[in-house]
Amino acid sequence: MHQSFDVVVIGGGHAGSEAAAAAARHGAKTALVTHKREAIGVMSCNPAIGGLGKGHLVREIDALDGLMGRVADAAGIQFRMLNRKKGPAVRGPRTQADRRLYREAMQREIDAMDNLTIIEGDAFDIEMDNDRVAAVIMKNGSRIPCGAVVLTSGTFLRGLIHIGSEKIPAGRVGEMPSLGLSDTLSRLGLAMGRLKTGTPARLDGRTIDWNAVDRQAADEDPVPFSFMTDHILNPQIECGVTRTTPASHKIIQDNIHLSAMYSGQIEGVGPRYCPSIEDKITRFGERDGHQIFLEPEGLDDYTIYPNGISTSLPAFVQEQFIRTIPGLEQVTILQPGYAIEYDYVDPRELKPSLECRKIPGLFLAGQINGTTGYEEAGAQGLVAGLNASLYAGSADPLHFSRTESYIGVMIDDLTSKGVSEPYRMFTSRAEYRLSLRVDNADLRLTPVAQKAGILGRERQQRFTDFLSDLDSVRALMKELSISPSQAAKQGLKLNQDGQRRSVYELLAYPDMTLQALAEHWPELNRLNAKVAEVLQIEASYAVYMQRQSADIVDIKRDEDRKIPDDFDFQSLSGLSNELKQKLEKARPENIAQAARVDGMTPAAISLLLALLRKGTATRSEQLRMHQ
């Protein structure tokens, strides 16, 4: 018998670490249950954090005082800002990470956390009392009483590795799957399915001909993920770049019937946006090559991750096709690539708080909800951990709007639409991406963290100072101004309309930069770099943001129009039975969510609104009669 906890988090991966940390920061007495303490923070697949859309999530996790941004900065060995030449709204920070440094940094963060206890072992079942979560039952029979549970099982629920025709029960290489919890979720009546993901072979970098491959360098001036990181201290390395060849493709095509994915033995659906090399050859057969990034797994590690050739072909076929790739002709394979399929829960079973609708006190986060990626998992973990703590303390949950964060976009997509394949974050999923940028994540979400009670003192002080600097510099930029005639004398092209324009307004002009304006106003050279960057981007988007603000107001109004938990969607007489069934399954909590259910039309929304207004009027009349 263990001591009682407010929150028990099952799983020590990226979702579990963030969930445990968020619950503990909020003040909940928290337990993190994991198979092995030393496996906390392990990067199971690619050794990288961030990217397009994903980098936004990492910045948002950091703005909420989560762990991933700081840990990535401590472990990053090749920082790059993707889409640097495009607009700020779609830029994506990314870094290669040293696997060992990442794991060690995450474990340091977890070990230093107050209110957090690590319990090693295998969680086997969840005990219920009056239809609510009451305890976690361990495989050894011991019991952990608790007020809420966050389940972050990753690929461990009935996990099955495939290498050709070989099947290995495992959550990841060398670790057994979780069978008991999968049975528990089925017993509790949750809708479940199977998904698949894959990973490439690991190569011995000492056997690669590095002179035969191209190189990709890190950015000269690396940009950290975390607001709290001043400088990146690790040496920055290069990655290799090579391509598959027609010879590679022929070997794959000739043996594709041996692939676990093409032989019919895998029932799970894989991620469309991270296809296996078999999928690439099948879907894009006209191409003569596919790019491969040779990514070192650490500063002191000769293991290479060949990003772009995940596969479930037999090991001997993998060796054959890999050795037809330039630079890899003599390579030694340290571990074959494989596919892994696992159970997941239909995320439409969840509320926006990530609590199960049918099981009060049970929260789910990460791949169990049908997502793929460390960043998606970490963001869900933070939300689930915080809301589990709020639930355990009988407080209202915190919901994230899709108008204020990529986290909100992801959770709304999952809980209102569900998934047919592993869900990955992209900037294109966010309607309001002009306002959801990586540069303003702190401005958007750190006040949310402060209000929720999960913001550390050091970050709070630094953020307060940053806001003060921002206000001062913004005022200066709006104070400094110039007339069209003065601008013409100084070589600045403005409309000759007689109106003075401030520096802040000038930054909205195409190709007008703070650096160029500093030639005319030298005081702009003395600005803090981060403050200057935020304000330059803010000013350049100001006109567009004004236009978008009306749409955001409309969305927030619809989010405020709540749908009662017991609302009878079958009573919507003007809707098709198919649409009623979709609404019953999705159980939208507000009009904004209902509008995103597949098949909903403006006419259907009008019917729903009319019935809600009628119900509100009826309840008001009943209240008056009882007074």
UniProtKB/Swiss-Prot annotation:
GO molecular function list: flavin adenine dinucleotide binding
InterPro entries in the record: FAD/NAD-bd_sf, GIDA_C_N, MnmG, MnmG-rel, MnmG-rel_CS, MnmG_C, MnmG_C_subdom, MnmG_C_subdom_sf
Record lineage: Bacteria, Pseudomonadati, Pseudomonadota, Alphaproteobacteria, Hyphomicrobiales
Amino-acid positions noted as binding NAD(+) in the UniProt annotation, renumbered to this chain: 270-284
Keywords, alphabetical: Cytoplasm, FAD, Flavoprotein, NAD, tRNA processing
Entry-linked HAMAP family: MnmG_GidA (MF_00129)
Organism encoding this protein: Agrobacterium fabrum (strain C58 / ATCC 33970) (Agrobacterium tumefaciens (strain C58))
GO annotation terms (biological process): tRNA methylation; tRNA wobble uridine modification
Protein name, entry field: tRNA uridine 5-carboxymethylaminomethyl modification enzyme MnmG
Function field: NAD-binding protein involved in the addition of a carboxymethylaminomethyl (cmnm) group at the wobble position (U34) of certain tRNAs, forming tRNA-cmnm(5)s(2)U34.
Similarity-based family: Belongs to the MnmG family.
Domain of life: Bacteria
Quaternary structure annotation from Swiss-Prot or TrEMBL: Homodimer. Heterotetramer of two MnmE and two MnmG subunits.
